[in-house]
């Protein structure tokens, strides 16, 4: 007699705690075709890091109430995953646990969850709804955003999010990979935009940063290829490395007079950027700050600048550069590969 196979919503259910166990089970089960549901063993307390990473044939995860922790990247890249039920035994969800699960459309966080890591749902391009139990003491949802209640930090956003006015910080990777996000209003309660907060939001075309913001984190808008304009107020004192790298649609950028350092890769690969006016608050242009801005023909370097890092303008189209006497250090190949320009390493004293 053939063994009866358990099903879930019409799919075969396979019990396994990681991808290796899943492969072994599939080898023994003739005729099983994806998609299928995976059931975690009822004796499992923690789903380990990378347990099912990139298992694209999994459509549903059945997690028992013995599980208290979902580890780092446990289900990252499970693009076929459309359904996951997190039981009320789970207290911790690790960094990038469901990263790039593009088939997920909604998530529900129960009242037991006390800690959610960075980028937990980053790159979930299909996500349109976020719900948190009203009884959860650590987190709440508002405007399709998941918010850490005590710190007022927006942890997870999605394509349909509206940032509430209670938020003071947009956390690391909060909107990363939300490719269907075309516009976002940042309220003037926000003081910090975290690392990779809007990275790879390719549908964003413009954004206005309120004058309450003092810091833009590393890679905050990296890879926002559709971004054509951005307004940065004078309140911003720090723009992190690679903050606007790969923003291939930007033609102009205003660097506020409050910034003292243009960090590494800040505007790298901004291929349509044609001119830059660097304010006299800037003292340092770090390595590869404007590398491969292939249409950059003009840059004004003020006499406040003392340092220009390695390959700062490498691969640009600069035809003339006025380097003031204030500059004491020019790094290796700082302007090399610009038409008509050649330069050896120079240290000015």
What spans do the regions from the language model cover?
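Structural signature of tandem-repeat unit edges
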Residues: 1-17, 32-46, 56-69, 79-92, ...
């Amino acid at each position: 007699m053939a063994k009866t196979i358990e099903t879930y919503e019409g799919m075969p259910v396979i019990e396994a705690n990681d991808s290796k166990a899943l492969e072994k089970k599939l080898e023994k089960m003739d005729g099983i075709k994806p998609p299928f549901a995976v059931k975690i063993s009822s004796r499992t307390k923690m789903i380990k890091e990378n347990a099912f990473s990139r298992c694209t044939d999994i459509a549903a995860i059945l997690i028992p109430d013995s599980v208290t922790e979902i580890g780092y990247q446990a289900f990252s890249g499970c693009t076929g995953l459309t359904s996951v039920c997190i039981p009320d035994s789970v207290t911790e969800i690790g960094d990038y646990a469901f990263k790039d699960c593009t088939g997920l459309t909604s998530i529900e966080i129960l009242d037991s969850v006390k800690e959610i890591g960075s980028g937990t749902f980053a790159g979930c391009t299909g996500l349109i709804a976020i719900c948190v139990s009203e009884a959860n003491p650590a987190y709440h949802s508002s405007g399709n955003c998941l918010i850490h209640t005590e710190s007022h930090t927006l942890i997870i956003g999605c394509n349909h999010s509206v940032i509430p006015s209670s938020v003071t910080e947009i956390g690391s990777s909060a909107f990363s990979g939300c490719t269907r996000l075309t516009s976002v209003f940042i309220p003037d309660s926000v003081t910090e935009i975290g690392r990779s907060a809007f990275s790879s939001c390719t549908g964003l075309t413009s954004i206005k940063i309120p004058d309450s913001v003092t810091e833009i984190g590393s890679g905050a808008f990296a890879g926002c290829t559709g971004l054509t304009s951005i307004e940065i107020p004078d309140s911003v004192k720090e723009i992190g490395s690679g903050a606007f790298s790969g923003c291939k649609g930007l033609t102009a950028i205003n660097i506020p007079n409050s910034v003292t350092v243009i960090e590494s890769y800040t505007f790298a690969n901004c291929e349509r950027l044609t001119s830059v006016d660097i304010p006299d608050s800037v003292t340092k242009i770090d390595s590869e700050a404007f590398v491969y801005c292939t249409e950059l023909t003009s840059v004004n370097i003020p006499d406040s600048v003392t340092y220009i890092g390695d390959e700062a303008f490498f691969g640009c189209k600069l035809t003339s550069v006025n380097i003031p006497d204030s500059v004491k250090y020019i790094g290796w190949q700082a302007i090399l590969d610009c038409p008509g320009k050649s330069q050896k390493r120079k240290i000015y004293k």
